[in-house]
Amino acid sequence: MILGFDTETCNGQLRVLASSSGHSISFAQNNYSLSDVETALKFLYEEGLAGDGYNVFWNINFDYSIILKPYIVEHEQELHDSRIAEIREKQRLALEQGNVTEHEADVYLRFQIGPYSLRLISHKGFVIKLKRKSVYFFDAANFYMSADDVHMSLDTAGERYLHVGKDEWGKKNRERMGSDPEFFDAHLSEITSYCIEDCKLTARLFEKTIESYRNLGLNFPEHPYSKASIFKQYLRDHETMTNCQNSYQTIKAAPIFRLIKDSYHGALNQIFGVGTFKNITDADINSAYPTAMRKLIDLTGAEMIV
């Protein structure tokens, strides 16, 4: 099962939060406060699917920044310091491995709002946790990219892949909805319906995503943060990750291993966790060296001679 979620705003404030189930909540203009943030999180937590199924937004960064806006404004310095601390930890790991990178993407932000624990993963999703239950939300737009490698709009993706666009009334009144509080209040029912239809379109597009991959014989991952999640699921299904470890142990035992390691100045994989880790394998479908990888020789069945 898939649930789509969406927000509607006016002058940068959350006014409507809805899901494809048809349920929604609304907030008064100029009155969205910290207590309302908890109300919104409660709606998402109780409405969202936990376990089997997926909860998806379209361009999730916008939605969670709007939902959390009062908290972000009040705790700006705290969140800034938290991000700095995690970036410094990444840099420390980079130094330990002989690599230093200025690219600080996908930093995890964790914080507490009322009884809810949140973890945000930039441009990919967020998790709401209460006691032992966690509800995950993902970005359906990550699977619909334009030729310029940017997210398609919901309207464009719907028309291209489902031959269904966004609601015409909403498209016609989009500007007034976003800037005129009196218009928003007068048409709250229509705007809520428009928001729910966007939720349904988001859910249908994500269903199309899953169907497309399954038609190729691929299992869809439990946590689809990005296209790389599909790739990693494929590797797990074919035990490629385990085979990589076996190959690595063979190479590591060779006398020339140190030369290989010392000459390597490529990408850096970072693990966010506490404790001792052994034999970690990771992979990413978006390689920085696609041309070189296409020229690699297939060494299946080869023997190493030292």
What are these regions (language model features)?
Residues 1-20, 287:
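Gly/Thr-rich phosphate-binding beta-strand-loop-beta motif of the actin/hexokinase/Hsp70
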Residues 5-7, 34, 56-60, 139, ...:
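Short His-Asn-centered micro-motif
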Residues 11, 179-182, 186-306:
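Common nucleic-acid-contacting/processivity interface regions adjacent to the catalytic cores
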Residues 11-30, 298:
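RNase H-like nuclease fold core
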Residues 18-19, 69-82, 295-305:
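Short secondary-structure boundary/capping segments
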Residues 29, 53, 57-69, 73-203, ...:
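Active-site-proximal helix-loop-helix substrate-binding element of RNase H-like nuclease domains
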Residues 33-54:
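Short, basic/hydrophobic alpha-helical segments
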Residues 45-52, 131, 273-277:
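Flexible, charged surface loops at secondary-structure boundaries
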